[in-house]
Amino acid sequence: LDKFGYPYCRGRLYNSIEIDNGQYDDVKEIFWACGACFFIRKKVFDLTNGFDNKFWAHMEEIDLCWRTQNLGYKIKYIYKSKVYHQNAGTLGQNSPKKTYLDFRNQLYMLTKNYKGNIFILLFFKVFVDFIISVFFLITRGIKHSLAIFHAYLSFYKQLKHLIIIRNRTNRKVIHYNTFSIVFNFIGLKRL
């Protein structure tokens, strides 16, 4: 995740995928692993209370990995693993519901787990997401733009409950080592 909670993967940033030239042939500690390709010990899964059922789909594995690290465990990337996964198979890449869940669940996850002042982060995030919603209006249509608006409405309805969860959460881990994936994407830096 970057500082603003936008996820990225090794070798992929948004829809830009690097050619595999072996640049990621290593074992490395990572912040999160895709739910389609990670293993977790049952004991650790139980300690974290597993996936948060409020998420249903999208970001639930990042939330789980974050909570796992807050308990002192590590998440590792093992390059020799082979995974075959149909991306966006549940809802489809162009689904406004996917857009809604991506933005809503990101807000849920950050509110629950972010180590710093969540309200300062949310203040900046609203502006960034507004710009994204305008971009989506132009590139994907009004349904995707409105999906972001609906994500915020749902989030604000749950905010009081999320703050209660946040106050009970052990927030040890700083979630980012990259300030903004957008800057990296523009600069074409390798993640």
Feature-to-residue mapping (PLM):
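Acidic/His-rich active-site region of diverse nucleotide-sugar glycosyltransferases
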Residues: L1-W56, I62, L71
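Glycine-rich phosphate/pyrophosphate-binding loop
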Residues: S16-I30, I163-L191
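A cytosolic small-molecule/anion-sensing beta-strand core signal
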Residues: C34, W66, Y79
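An amphipathic alpha-helix/helix-turn recognition signal
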Residues: E60-D63, L101
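Short active-site alpha-helical segment characteristic of glycosyltransferases
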Residues: D63-R67, V83
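Active-site-adjacent helix/loop segment of glycosyltransferases
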Residues: L71, I75-I164, Y176-F179
